[in-house]
A protein has these predicted regions:
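Small-molecule-sensing regulatory modules
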Residues: 2-48, 55, 141-316
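A conserved helix-loop-strand patch within extracytoplasmic ligand-binding domains
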Residues: 82-83, 91-145, 208
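Paired acidic/hydrophobic, glycine-rich loop segments that form the ligand-binding mouth/hinge
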Residues: 71, 76-80, 166-171
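Short, structured active-site "lid" loops
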Residues: 50-77
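Short glycine-rich anion-binding loops that position phosphate/pyrophosphate groups of nucleotides
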Residues: 82-85, 173-175
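Short, well-ordered beta-strand segments
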Residues: 7-9, 78, 96, 129, ...
């Protein structure tokens, strides 16, 4: 950080830049006099579009270059989609804050856009594109008679596949942040399809030590604290704890979704694909939580672990 300018690492994709700009504007608005600059870069996950994420490293491929920029002092913070982050960050880094969650659902876009056929109305054998094995196992549970085609790339690239597919499934949050919600045919409820852990959440990562460049880490923490959403942070901790407990990443059809059922009750639901039995396991856990308590993060983490334990019992 130089003077009052915050350097923010981001991927170069249009969605990443849009999301990072949203986060940066929120930080600047909460800290009068603070300015920022984006430090954009291309990650391994952006470059290797010819292979599935599971085949060459999973979630970390979208954040490694940004973390290197933090370590080398080229950036003060990094903005990620939480669903792109591994369940546990490396010791030298910290999940500092998260912004309020955007729509966590998955969206179906048919050929023809908003006026196209809804997912359940597609004819047998219709071809639907998605780059997520999590989505595929849940979509197959709804419509085993369809063909699911792997696709990768940015939002526009995936939407262009509609020329050869009958529909695609994308995260609602990205579509809304890119101003493309008007193209959505329908949204899947979280009961129909559980979203990826962390989906719709923007996470801000920092070094976990005092920066050797610019201001102290403590000062950056105080700047970021003004934009943290406490409820979303608790939700993020619970969902990522579930993934960590199952040692899961992009290679596994696994998901969790937490939400506050009321002001003091955090409920988390999870799924896990049992490859041996070809069965989609499901479970849920609820617990009272006081966001004002000092141990709120520990409680959120424990809720995620309890959910994972419940799933593991079904695997025995």
């Amino acid at each position: 950080m130089t003077d009052s300018k915050l350097r923010i690492a981001t991927r170069k994709s249009a969605l990443a830049v849009a999301q990072t700009t949203m986060a940066a504007d929120a930080i600047a608005a909460a800290n009068p006099g603070l300015t920022y600059e984006l430090v954009s870069m291309t990650t391994e996950g952006d470059r290797r579009l010819d292979k599935s994420l599971a085949s060459f490293g999973g979630k970390g491929v979208f954040i490694k270059e940004l973390e290197v920029a933090l370590l080398e002092g080229r950036a003060d913070i990094a903005v990620h989609s939480l669903k792109d982050m591994p369940a546990e960050v490396l010791p030298q880094f910290k999940l500092a804050v998260v912004l309020r969650r955007e729509d966590p659902r998955d969206a179906f876009i048919a050929r023809g856009g908003a006026a196209g056929l809804k997912f359940m109305d597609l004819p047998a054998g219709a071809r639907v594109g998605t780059g997520s094995i999590r989505r595929v196992v849940q979509l197959k549970a709804l419509r085993p008679d369809l063909e699911y085609v792997p696709i990768r790339g940015n939002i526009q690239t995936r939407l262009s596949k509609l020329a050869e597919l009958d529909g695609v499934v994308l995260a609602a949050a990205g579509l809304k942040r890119m101003g493309l919600a008007d193209q959505v045919t329908e949204y899947f409820s979280t009961e129909q399809m559980l979203p990826a852990s962390g989906q719709g959440i923007l996470a801000i990562e920092t070094l976990n030590v005092i920066a050797s460049h610019g201001v102290a880490k403590q000062s950056i923490d105080s700047i970021l604290a003004r934009v943290n959403d406490a409820k979303t942070y608790a939700i993020a901790v619970a969902e990522m704890a579930y993934l960590k407990a199952l040692n899961a990443g992009c290679q596994f059809p696994v998901a969790s979704f937490a939400e506050f059922a009321d002001a003091e009750t955090l409920m988390i639901r999870g799924i896990y694909w049992d490859e041996n039995k070809k069965n989609l396991l499901k479970s849920e856990v609820s617990r009272k939580m006081d966001l004002s308590c000092a141990n709120v993060i520990d409680v959120a983490r424990q809720i995620g672990i309890e959910l994972a334990d419940s799933i593991c019992m079904q695997l025995r």
